[in-house]
C-alpha cells in the first residue's frame, strides 16, 4: 500500500516513521550492514509471498529496491535505469518459478512452524511439490519436517512431501527424505529462506 513505508526500509531496521520529522526522514541514512540484512529478509518475504495460494501483489518499485518512510518518501518515481539488479533479478526468477511450477501456482496448501522463528509452506499438485521455508532469526535454523507436521492451512494433513528436493536458488543441492522417519532435514540460513522443488525419481 502507498500508505505504508517501503518494505525494504522496514526490513533494514529503519526507525518507525512516526518517530522522525519529515526533515529527518528526508535525510535519513541507512546503515550498509542493515541494508544487506534487509535484502536477505526481503528475499525471504518475497519467496513466502510467491509460495502462497493467492496471486502475488508487489507495490510498484519494491522489486527495484525502492526505499522510503512515510508519504511522500514512500511514493517516489520508479527508478528507471537505477533499479537494484539483484532484487529485480530475484523477483523475475521467482515469477518464472511460480509460472512454470504447477504446485507453486495452483497446488494444495498446508503450513507448518518448525520453531518460533521458522515457517514452512508446502504446495502439492500431482507429482509436483514445492516446499518453502523462511527463518526470521539471526542464526541458522535446523529442522526435520514430514507431511504430518503440516497441520494448518486449507489442505492440512492432506499433502505429501516428496522423496527428493532440489534447492531452486542456491547450488541446486539435493535433499532426500529419510526413509526411516519420512522427514526432510533442512538448514534455513539466518534471515533467509529455502525454496525446494521436488525431483522426479530417476
Where are these regions (language model features)?
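Active-site and adjacent substrate-binding regions of carbohydrate-active enzymes
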Residues: 1-202
Amino acid at each position: 500500500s502507498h500508505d505504508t513505508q517501503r518494505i525494504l526500509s522496514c526490513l533494514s531496521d529503519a526507525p518507525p516513521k512516526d518517530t522522525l520529522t519529515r526533515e529527518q526522514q528526508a535525510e535519513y541514512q541507512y546503515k550498509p550492514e542493515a541494508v544487506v540484512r534487509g535484502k536477505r529478509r526481503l528475499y525471504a518475504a518475497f519467496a513466502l509471498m510467491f509460495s502462497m495460494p493467492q496471486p502475488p501483489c508487489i507495490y510498484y518499485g519494491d522489486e527495484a529496491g525502492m526505499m522510503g518512510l512515510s508519504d511522500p518518501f514512500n511514493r517516489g518515481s520508479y527508478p528507471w535505469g537505477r533499479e537494484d539488479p539483484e532484487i529485480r533479478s530475484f523477483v523475475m526468477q521467482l515469477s518464472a518459478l511460480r509460472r512454470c511450477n504447477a504446485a507453486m501456482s495452483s497446488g494444495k496448501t498446508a503450513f507448518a512452524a518448525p520453531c518460533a522463528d521458522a515457517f514452512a509452506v508446502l504446495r502439492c499438485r500431482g507429482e509436483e511439490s514445492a516446499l518453502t521455508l523462511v527463518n526470521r532469526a539471526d542464526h541458522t535454523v535446523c529442522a526435520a519436517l514430514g507431511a504430518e507436521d503440516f497441520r494448518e492451512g486449507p489442505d492440512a494433513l492432506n499433502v505429501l512431501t516428496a522423496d527428493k528436493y532440489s534447492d531452486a536458488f542456491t547450488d541446486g543441492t539435493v535433499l532426500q527424505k529419510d526413509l526411516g522417519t519420512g522427514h526432510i532435514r533442512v538448514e534455513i540460513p539466518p534471515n533467509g529462506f529455502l525454496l525446494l522443488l521436488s525431483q522426479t525419481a530417476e
